[in-house]
């Protein structure tokens, strides 16, 4: 708990899980950027029972991709051993936690609005702005 302006605010924790899976796209991003981690997932519980991210919808093929649920015992995590990773715990207010959870649920329910775009990834790396509808 923390105090803000005389009020008591309870805190919750969001978990940020960074990985480099060794997939074709992960290796490409790694080579282009040199970033230690190439993928980020969000979890709402400490045991990481369900991770949320923008990734492949089928654990075995790169496309289609978009908002997805990931599980540590399936897909890429099951196919590869010794995946480099880092886990961060971010304390947030109850209000921020609820907003993050609602936004994540909205993205999962309306995945067609949040498609992954590999061309956009390349343009982003090149610092080229690309305006698209609904983005």
Over which residues does each language-model region extend?
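Compositionally biased, low-complexity repeat tracts
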Residues: 2-3, 18, 62, 71, ...
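Short, Lys/Arg-enriched N-terminal segments with co-localized hydrophobic residues
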Residues: 1-10
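Glycine-rich catalytic cores of cysteine/serine-nucleophile enzymes that process amide/ester linkages
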Residues: 19-88, 125-129
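Short, functional N-terminal and low-complexity linear motifs
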Residues: 8, 65-74, 89, 106-114
């Amino acid at each position: 708990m923390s105090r803000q302006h005389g009020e008591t605010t309870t805190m919750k924790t969001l978990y940020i899980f960074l990985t480099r899976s060794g997939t074709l796209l992960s290796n490409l991003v790694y080579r282009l950027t040199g970033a230690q981690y190439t993928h980020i997932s969000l979890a709402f519980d400490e045991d990481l029972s369900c991770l949320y991210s923008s990734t492949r919808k089928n654990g075995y093929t790169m496309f289609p991709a978009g908002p997805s649920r990931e599980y540590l015992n399936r897909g890429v995590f099951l196919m590869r051993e010794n995946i480099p990773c880092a886990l961060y715990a971010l304390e947030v207010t109850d209000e921020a936690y609820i907003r993050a959870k609602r936004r994540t649920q909205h993205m999962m329910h309306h995945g067609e609005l949040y498609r992954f775009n590999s061309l956009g990834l390349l343009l982003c790396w090149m610092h080229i702005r690309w305006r698209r509808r609904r983005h």
